[in-house]
Amino acid sequence: MPYNCCLPALSCRTSCSSRPCVPPSCHGCTLPGACNIPANVGNCNWFCEGSFNGNEKETMQFLNDRLASYMEKVRQLERENAELECRIQERNQQQDPLVCPAYQAYFRTIEELQQKILCSKSENARLVVQIDNAKLAADDFRTKYETELGLRQLVESDINGLRRILDELTLCKSDLEAQVESLKEELLCLKRNHEEEVNTLRCQLGDRLNVEVDAAPTVDLNRVLNETRCQYEAMVETNRREVEEWFTTQTEELNKQVVSSSEQLQSCQAEIIELRRTVNALEIELQAQHCMRNSLENTLTESEARYSSQLSQVQCLITNVESQLGEIRADLERQNQEYQVLLDVKARLECEINTYRGLLESEDCKLPCNPCATSNACGKPIGPCVSNPCVPCPPPAPCTPCVPRPRCGPCNSFVR
C-alpha cells in the first residue's frame, strides 16, 4: 500500500545550499513504537540540493509502511468487528421468534399446570376432609347401631323373660283351673255322699219309732253343709277373681311391653335399614372418590413426567443458548481487548506521527528559501523520491532568509 504524504512543498524545493539534519537534541529521544526504526535516523549529514539523504528516506519509508500496516490491521479488525456484530444481530433476530414465544408458552403452560395442581390438591384435600367426615359419621352410626343392637338384645331378653313368665302363669292358670275342676268334682262327690248318707239315715229312721226325748236340739247338717259349701264357693270365687285380675293386669302389662318393644323394634329395624343404605352409599362414594383420586394421581404423574421432559429439553436449549452467549461474550471480550490494543497502537502511532510532523516542520524551516525550484544546480530534479543524492555542487549563491511555511496537513491519505 503506497503512502502519499500531504507535503507538496517538500518535493518542489530546490537549493544549492546545504541544511543541517535533525538537531542533536533529538537524536537520543525514544519515540513510542519506534523500537524497529533503523539506527541511521538522525545522523547529521548535509542535504544535497534540498533532498533527504538515503537513510532518512529509508526510515520514513519504513515508518510509512509500518503506519500503513497498522492502519490496514485496524481497518481489518473493524471490518471483522462489524461482521461479528452483524452475525450477532442476525442470530438474535433468528432466535428471538423461536426462543422467547416458546419460553412464554412454556411459562404459561407451567403456570396453568401449577394452577391445575393447586386445584387438584385443594380438591384432594376437600375429598379427604369429606372422607374423614364420612368416616366419622359412619363411626357414629356404627356406635348408634351397636347401642341400638344392645338395646334390642336387652328388649328381646326381656321379652323372652316375660314369655317365660307368661308360660309359667299359663301353667299356673291351668293348674288352678285343674284344681277348681277337682274341687268342683270333690264338691259334687261330697254332695252325692251327703245325699246318700241323708237318704240312708232317713230310711233307717223311717222304720223306727218316734221317741221324743228331752235333749239338746239337733244340728241341721244340711244347713251346715250349705254354709260350708257357700264359704268354700266364696273363697274359690275370691281366689279366682284375684287370679283373673292378676293375670289380666300382667297380660295387659306384657301386651303393652310387647307393643312398645315391637314399635321400638320396627323403628330400630327401619333405622338399621336406613343406616345400611347410608353406609352402602358412603362406601360407593368412597370407592368412586378413590378411583377419582387414583385417576388424578395417574394424570398428575403423567403430566409431571411429560412436562419434566419438556422442561429438560427447554433447559438443554437454554444451556445451549447460554453457552453460545458465553462464547459470543468471550469473543466480544477478546475483540474488545484487541480493539483496546489497537487503540493503544493507534495512540502510539499518532504520537509518532506528531513527532515526525514536528521533525518534518523543523526540517522544512531549515530548507532553502527558493521553494518553487524543481531542479538543483546540476540540472537534476530533487524530491523525496530521488534515490541517489546529487553530486557535489558549486558553492551556493547567497539567498534571502526563508519565510516559515505553514504546517502541512496530517498524513491521512492512503491509496490502495
UniProtKB/Swiss-Prot annotation:
Show the GO MF annotations. Answer: structural molecule activity
Q: What is this protein called?
A: Keratin, type I cuticular Ha1
Q: Which family does it belong to?
A: Belongs to the intermediate filament family.
Q: Does the keyword Transferase apply?
A: no
Per the record, the gene is Krt31
**What are the start and end residues of every segment in region (Coil 1B)?**
103-203
Q: Which PROSITE patterns match?
A: IF_ROD_1 (PS00226), IF_ROD_2 (PS51842)
Stretches assigned to the IF rod domain = 56-367
- Keyword Coiled coil part of the UniProt annotation: yes
Q: Where is this region: Head?
A: 2-56
Residues of the region (Coil 2) are 220-363
